[in-house]
Amino acid sequence: MAQPVPRLSIPAALALGSAALGAAFATGLLLGKRWPPWGSRRQERLLPPEDNPLWQYLLSRSMREHPALRSLRLLTLEQPQGDSMMTCEQAQLLANLARLIKAKKALDLGTFTGYSALALALALPEAGRVVTCEVDAEPPKLGRPMWKQAEVEQKIDLRLQPALQTLDELLAAGEAGTFDIAVVDADKENCTAYYERCLQLLRPGGVLAVLRVLWRGEVLQPQPRNKTVECVRNLNERILRDARVYISLLPLDDGLSLAFKI
């Protein structure tokens, strides 16, 4: 019998397998039915108990995490608010999508410690580029050594300024329609503006991913209790009705929306 795989000790590997992509989708669909996205912090992230046999099986049969990614994830989880980082399942799914569409240019809104930027950079070719946006200069310092360790530091363009400013600069520089994938995990008050600008920057066939679109289940409230919940709900409605994209909303972690530009 296989030994349990602790959530924070997932085997690392570099290879890409089509089964991993399917497992990521299946994991979200299964966990979304069994564990609601509210309550304790673990429940908020749609995670079952670490000793759950089915969860162990899913992790052990799907996760292929680069050593530098694993190291950065473990370091991040030791930091204040470290659990606000994208989960390894989400990172692997987005990296696999980037590989699937042969992405060369990526946007990453909300660098934090650089885990998502690293995952994307590893999925891009040697000449690939990840533009990652962060307003706080401190968290990315944790990730820089791992970017270097993974030999992708040259692919990552860190912009320490408001994400909207970076997006507007890219549009002004004539880069509309040139990006392949965009990941939005930044403040929710500007999420609609991020969505619209990223959509302009993406090429047809590009992928736009928005994280935390269930917001701990508060999107179910009849009346949003704050501006953040209202913004998330408004964005979800906008994406649903947007004829410019094909969509999927997955119950991975606190909700992951995927919009595929037509």
Swiss-Prot record:
One of its GO terms (molecular function) is O-methyltransferase activity. It is an enzyme of class 2 (transferase). It comes from the Eukaryota. It is found in: Membrane. GO terms for biological process: methylation. The chain crosses the membrane at residues 12-32. It is a single-pass type II membrane protein. CDD domains: AdoMet_MTases. InterPro entries: Cation-dep_OMT (IPR050362), SAM-dependent_MTases_sf (IPR029063), SAM_O-MeTrfase (IPR002935). Pfam families: Methyltransf_3. Its EC number is 2.1.1.-. Homodimer. Belongs to the class I-like SAM-binding methyltransferase superfamily. Cation-dependent O-methyltransferase family. This is Catechol O-methyltransferase domain-containing protein 1. It comes from Mus musculus. The lineage of its organism: Eukaryota, Metazoa, Chordata, Craniata, Vertebrata.
